[in-house]
């Protein structure tokens, strides 16, 4: 379950930012996650709740913003929507796709005190 190490990394990032930006508590956290990031959202929620106990993010609301997956098709030279990494191009059926969006995991916004 790599979601645990991801949650731990998020808490570490929050602690670093708390020092740099002078806040003491995280009330809410918005994460952008793409469908190609290989992250189980419910597992991440569970792990986040577990690793934030006793930290500045304990009790913080975790909001997930799901990004769409997009790729550039080398077969028809079009930007297309995809749900999985190995989807075929919905326009021409080619599998020669380069992912351009959807494999992200990033902190979008924080609400802090």
Swiss-Prot record:
Disulfide bonds: none annotated. GO terms for molecular function: nickel cation binding; zinc ion binding. Signal peptide: none annotated. It comes from the Bacteria. Keywords: Metal-binding, Nickel, Zinc. One of its GO terms (biological process) is protein maturation. Ni(2+) binds at residue 2. Zn(2+) binds at residues 73, 76, 89, 92. The keyword Zinc applies. Involved in the maturation of [NiFe] hydrogenases. Required for nickel insertion into the metal center of the hydrogenase. NCBIfam families: hypA, PRK12380.1. Belongs to the HypA/HybF family. This is Hydrogenase maturation factor HypA. It comes from Azotobacter vinelandii. The gene is hypA.
């Amino acid at each position: 379950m790599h979601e645990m190490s991801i949650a731990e990394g998020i808490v570490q990032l929050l602690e670093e930012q708390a020092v740099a930006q002078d806040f003491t508590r995280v009330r809410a956290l918005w994460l952008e996650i793409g469908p190609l990031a290989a992250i189980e959202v419910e597992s991440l929620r569970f792990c986040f709740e577990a690793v934030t106990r006793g930290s500045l993010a304990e009790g913080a609301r975790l909001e997930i913003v799901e990004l769409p997956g997009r790729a550039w098709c080398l077969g028809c030279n079009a930007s297309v929507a995809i749900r999985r990494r190995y989807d075929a191009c919905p326009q021409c059926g080619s599998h020669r796709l380069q992912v351009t969006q959807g494999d992200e995991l990033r902190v979008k916004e924080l609400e802090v005190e």
